[in-house]
Amino acid sequence: MYTAKTAVMQAHSVGMHMSREQIADALIEASEGLIENVYYKSETTLPFKADLHQENGFLRGHDEGNVAVENGLKFHIDWLRGQKTGFFVDQRENRSLLEHYAKGRNVLNMFCYTGGFSVYAMRGGANLVHSVDSSAKAIDLTRANAEMNFPGD
């Protein structure tokens, strides 16, 4: 996945937090130019007893937009205020798999968040896609992502 040349990093341990600068440098170096910015989003994930008072922010670079491209589909990503790192990249294979099963079917995407599964189902030829989330912000994000990929549909 490509997110506007930005990697979002999240630490869940004090050790990873203490190594964040080296990890950011390694991400940039290993990406061979694909990553220029590293956003650190660990304000709420670090152990509270460690008393680190970490605020979210850029370790390297700056905000260059928030559109990710995955398998030719575009997604608005809100890594600043969104859930976790903003987009669940571990679901990439599952989204792609759904695309192959969607043709001619009705699809219900519960807890849609960015609408990733919905957008893949649409591209896969689903007859109807329902996207459900308790968050109005998530529904707006899903609509925006569907419109960006399928204008006028």
Language-model regions: role of each:
Residues 1-4, 105:
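Non-catalytic accessory regions of SAM-dependent methyltransferases
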Residues 13, 44, 135:
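Flexible, active-site-proximal loop/turn residues at the rims of small-molecule/cofactor binding pockets
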Residues 4, 13, 81:
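Short, histidine-centered active-site or binding-site loop motifs used for metal coordination
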